């Protein structure tokens, strides 16, 4: 009589175990976690996500500080001067360390070899397969950009082309006040500050953005209603 009881219990056990299995991969992650790490593109996008959201303060601080110093240097000096100073600084460090290790080895009469041997032996060659993969990924974005440019300049959609014209008109005023390097500095400050501020005050920001979106949508609809070509297309 023990066998039937075991048989009756086994389906419930198997069903409970089978019900527990799907919950493991589908379990919701933390709110700030980056989704889907299945592919290389997802992992790279998640790395950028973690970088601009200051998940690793040391790593983000290093990237932010280095790029900011580079941009400030380019604002004060020419590109040739900045690149030359960077190469000189790097060579000063490596040559000094090479001489220092050679002197230490001569004094101690040791044969540790080249101090950078581990890095010299690293294989940094780019395979043809990897090159083609990068080129294919780049071509997707290039083709998409070309299609968008053709659409805008050949006025496939009048509203989109007018938006571009207004944006470019505003950029003429921005260009009169700021140069390219200044805009890059401002862009970097925004990239490394806006996401973390948005994450902290998401509810309030979404509320005001929704109001602004509704106002913009109503204005665009009024403009479209006054344009005969677009009104006719909508009626059709």
From Swiss-Prot:
It is found in: Endoplasmic reticulum membrane; Golgi apparatus membrane. InterPro entries: Reticulon (IPR003388), RTN1-4 (IPR046964). One of its GO terms (biological process) is vesicle-mediated transport. Residues 1-24 have a biased composition (Low complexity). Keywords: Acetylation, Apoptosis, Endoplasmic reticulum, ER-Golgi transport, Golgi apparatus, Membrane, Phosphoprotein, Transmembrane, Transmembrane helix, Transport. Transmembrane segments: none annotated. Homodimer. Interacts with RTN4. Interacts with BACE1, BACE2, BCL2 and FADD. Interacts with ATL1 and ATL2. Interacts with TMEM33. Interacts with ZFYVE27 and with KIF5A in a ZFYVE27-dependent manner. Interacts with RIGI. Interacts with TRIM25. This is Reticulon-3. It comes from Pongo abelii (Sumatran orangutan).
């Amino acid at each position: 009589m023990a066998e039937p009881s075991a048989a009756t219990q086994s389906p419930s056990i198997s069903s409970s175990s089978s019900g527990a299995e799907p919950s493991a991969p589908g379990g919701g992650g933390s709110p700030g976690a980056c989704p889907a790490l299945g592919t290389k593109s997802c992992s790279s996008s998640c790395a950028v996500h973690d970088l601009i959201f200051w998940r690793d303060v040391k790593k983000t601080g290093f990237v932010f500080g280095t790029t900011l110093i580079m941009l400030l240097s380019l604002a004060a000096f020419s590109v040739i001067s900045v690149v030359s100073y960077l190469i000189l600084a790097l060579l000063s460090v490596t040559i000094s360390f090479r001489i220092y290790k050679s002197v230490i080895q001569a004094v101690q009469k040791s044969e540790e070899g080249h101090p950078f041997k581990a890095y010299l032996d690293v294989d940094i060659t780019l395979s043809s397969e990897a090159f083609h993969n990068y080129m294919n990924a780049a071509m997707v974005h290039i083709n998409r950009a070309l299609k968008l440019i053709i659409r805008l300049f050949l006025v496939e959609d009048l509203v989109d082309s007018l938006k571009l014209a207004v944006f470019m008109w505003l950029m003429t005023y921005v260009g009169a006040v700021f140069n390219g390097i200044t805009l890059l500095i401002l862009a970097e400050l925004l990239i490394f500050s806006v996401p973390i501020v948005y994450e902290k005050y998401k509810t309030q920001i979404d509320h005001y953005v929704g109001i602004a979106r509704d106002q913009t949508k109503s204005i665009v609809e009024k403009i479209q209603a006054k344009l005969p070509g677009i009104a006719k297309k909508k009626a059709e």
